[in-house]
Curated annotation (Swiss-Prot):
Alphabetical UniProt keywords: ATP-binding, Chaperone, Nucleotide-binding, Phosphoprotein, Stress response
Protein task: Acts as a chaperone.
Name assigned to this protein: Chaperone protein DnaK
CDD domains xref list: ASKHA_NBD_HSP70_DnaK-like
């Protein structure tokens, strides 16, 4: 059995981990980083960039660079949160035929958020494969605890598109608790995991206990907000910078996608810098231009100002903490440890708010960027049988039920119920001689059905005619360990039954998923070919440089015909490099290599010839010296002088 890898598919960054020698290990990507930006870009020449390379070119390609798509996954276009996001991102967001929020490139290509997320998952998969030296097909993927059924299904679909069998969907705070508590001793304790990531917020109250020699992680309650995270903090800074620039220059940068992308990068950097310093400067030269010439943005931002801009967002994260404690039947003083997860928890204001609410300083020994992936790898180890004596008891974050007469939401499974679980309730018909009933499955906490999330509708037909209230229809809900729901309705008299795995009226059909899987496979092949082409070009480029250097050094020593052949081979290779024919580039590279070898051989021969001539001259000089006769002479005195 191969490794089951653990992937934290984050809004801003993603991370992959494996069990290695009994311990979870975070794997560095091809750039040497332990986390990878969850960013995917489509370039003009058809290349798909993922991670740091996509982030680097975002400023020059804003409409084709997709980030924070996790906030769109499993959502309808009409959702208020999606509508709010449209004004904050430079790329296109539109409604698919089924009402889902999809994204669009500048040339009109439409894609589901699942396809974008699949690209990030592929990068994580390849990172693990490169490290392990073997193919990876199975994974545990994390999601925010407060993700609903549609969002969980969509995440599983993204895994399928990426070529992964998703063995388990695990909640992010639960994964972080696993990472924190697996090797900790010291008896039973209750911990709060406060997870404020790039796009989502969760809080889970978890009890860690030793039960019959087994370490048990039981989620007592969870709560959160799937549209609250670091992106919102960034957006507050962007809004402030845009407003200040507008006051100063009278230009609204919201209408300029390039400027908006530069502002996003600058806002994120400023926010990070203000976690360790009291003041920073946002300096963007040539941010835009008008008839009077180029405009520069230069604004000082203090930590106090940043804290004022995001104060309500920080407060917004505390209310779910209060609700989770109440649902768990606990007080803040009952919590033994507070764990911070997610990059946004590095902000001092956030840390202070958490400390004030729980009455204790949060722990600083958990890596907020890596803990979730580590926990996912541990869960993968449990499923693979590599990690023993660990039991994880998670919960469903929202109540599940059906719509009954008068538009009432009737709960069948209450929120914070431990999963997997099953529950049934018996209902009847609303009219005389009714032969079919429609089961409308919903998820949420509102009493009125219309205010909750609609997951699916299906019909149970073939009910025998009878007065209203007489037929008995048993509706059963079954939630698996991934938090994904299966529903059945059965007529007790006829035993006719209708079953459905909830795939959300939104979401992707099997045909769409298969198409996307095929596209991903084709793209993987294209990516491989592209990498091979780049490698061939790089090799050719290096050879061209080396050959030109050789001509400069040795050209004067060899004949014109040799140089002519080398120059011709150089020209042919440079022409080939302008095209995309790898075979032609490789063939002409070989031709140049051979021509280069003849150049070196001719140069070596010329040098040897020169050495032979020099040796001959030296020999003759030596012989002449040998012919000189030493003679004795006597001095003759001339007396005549």
């Amino acid at each position: 059995m191969g490794k089951i890898i653990g992937i934290d598919l984050g809004t801003t960054n993603s991370c992959v981990s494996i069990m290695d020698g009994g311990k979870a290990r975070v794997i560095e990507n091809s750039e040497g980083d332990r986390t990878t930006p969850s960013i995917v870009a489509y370039t003009k020449d058809g290349e798909v960039l993922v991670g740091a390379s996509a982030k680097r070119q975002a400023v020059t390609n804003p409409k084709n660079t997709f980030y924070a798509v996790k906030r769109l996954i499993g959502r309808k276009f009409t959702d208020g949160e999606v509508q709010k996001d449209i004004s904050h991102v430079p790329y296109g967001i539109l409604a698919h035929d089924n009402g889902d929020a999809w994204v669009q490139t500048s040339d009109g290509k439409r894609m589901a958020p699942q396809e974008i997320s699949a690209r990030v998952l592929e990068k994580m998969k390849k990172t693990a494969e490169d490290f392990l030296g073997e193919k990876v097909t199975e994974a545990v993927i994390t999601v925010p605890a407060y993700f609903n059924d549609s969002q969980r299904q969509a995440t599983k679909d993204a895994g399928r598109i990426a070529g992964l069998d998703v063995k388990r969907i695990i909640n992010e705070p639960t994964a972080a608790a696993l990472a924190y508590g697996l090797d900790k001793n010291g008896g039973d304790r209750k911990i709060a995991v406060y997870d404020l990531g790039g796009g989502t917020f969760d809080v889970s109250i978890i009890e860690i206990a030793e039960v019959d020699g087994e370490k048990q992680f039981e989620v007592l309650a969870t709560n959160g907000d799937t549209f609250l995270g670091g992106e919102d903090f960034d957006n507050r800074v962007i809004e402030y910078l845009v407003d200040e620039f507008n006051k100063d220059q009278g230009i609204d940068l919201r209408k300029d996608p390039l400027a908006l992308q530069r502002l996003k990068d600058a806002a994120e950097r400023a926010k990070i810098e203000l976690s360790s310093s009291q003041q920073t400067e946002v300096n963007l030269p040539y941010v835009t231009a008008d008839a009077s010439g180029p405009k520069h943005l230069n604004i000082k931002l203090t930590r106090a100002k940043l804290e004022a801009l995001v104060e309500d967002l920080v407060k917004k994260s505390i209310e779910p903490c209060r609700t989770a404690l109440n649902d768990a039947g606990l007080r803040a003083s009952d919590i033994n440890e507070v764990i911070l997860v997610g990059g946004q928890t590095r902000m001092p204001k956030v840390q202070q708010a958490v400390a004030d609410f729980f009455g204790k300083e949060p722990r600083k020994d958990v890596n907020p960027d890596e803990a979730v992936a580590v926990g996912a790898a541990i869960q993968g180890g449990v499923l693979a049988g590599d990690v023993k004596d660990v039991l994880l008891l998670d919960v469903t974050p929202l109540s599940l039920g059906i719509e009954t007469m008068g538009g009432v939401f009737t709960k069948i499974i209450e929120k914070n119920t431990t999963i997997p679980t099953k529950a049934s309730q018996t209902f009847s018909t609303a009219e005389d001689n009714q032969s079919a009933v429609t089961v409308h499955v919903l998820q949420g906490e509102r009493e009125q059905a219309r205010f909750n999330k609609s997951l699916a509708k299906f019909d149970l037909s073939g009910i025998e005619p009878a007065p209203r209230g007489m037929p008995q229809v048993e509706v059963s809900f079954d939630i698996d360990a991934n938090g994904i729901l299966h529903v059945s309705a059965k007529d007790k008299k006829t035993n006719k039954e209708q079953k459905v795995e909830i795939k959300a009226g939104s979401g992707l059909s099997d045909e769409e998923i298969q198409r996307m899987v095929a596209d991903a496979e084709a793209n993987r092949e294209e990516d491989k070919k592209f990498q091979e082409l780049v490698q061939a070009r790089n090799q050719a480029d290096g050879l061209i440089h080396a050959t030109r250097t050789a001509i400069t050094e040795h050209g004067s020593k060899v004949g014109g015909d040799v140089i002519g052949k080398v120059e011709a081979a150089l020209s042919d290779l440079e022409t080939a490099m302008k095209g995309d024919d790898k075979a032609q580039i490789e063939a002409r590279t070989k031709t140049l290599e051979e021509a280069g070898q003849s150049l070196y051989a001719a140069a070596a021969a010329a040098e040897q010839g020169g050495n032979a001539d020099a040796a001959s001259g030296n020999a003759q000089a030596s012989k002449a010296a040998d012919d000189v006769v030493d003679a004795e002479f006597t001095e003759v005195k001339d007396d005549k002088k």
